[in-house]
Amino acid sequence: LLARIKQLLTLFSSEAENQLISAAQIQQLVAAHYASANFSISYLADNFHVSIAYMSYLFKKEMGENFSDYVWALRLGKAKELLLNTDMSIDDISLAVGYVNTSSFRRKFKQATGMTPSQLRG
């Protein structure tokens, strides 16, 4: 019984603390770090002092989509902007939006847009 009470108290206190995490706070942190190749849900969880599972739940609840889809959309948007408005190489753009593996970036870009980065650039 004591173990169950302790478990419930931990859960409730954790949830109460985490209610203080807002969508704006999440967006601010994601916007500041999405281009880092090491950026992950665990980084967010560590920053907000919550578990990865809870951060995943909270992210989806607050942002309306899962972490990886949200970050990919940011990276894709920035990549398109750089392709259309700069003369940066595709390799440099890949790195600038958080992809160390350019092949992976090109493949994912084509899956998302139906064209390669070079085709978008024209």
List each model region and its residues.
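Catalytic-core segments of nucleotide cyclases and related cyclic-nucleotide turnover enzymes
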Residues: 2
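Basic, amphipathic alpha-helical hairpins
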Residues: 6-18, 27-39, 58-63, 80-89, ...
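Terminal helix-turn-helix DNA-binding modules in bacterial transcription factors
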Residues: 28, 61-100, 122
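Basic/polar phosphate-binding segments, predominantly the helix-turn-helix DNA-binding elements
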Residues: 42-71, 94-116
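C-terminal interaction modules of eukaryotic adaptor/scaffold proteins
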Residues: 119
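N-terminal pre-P-loop "Q-motif" helix
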Residues: 22
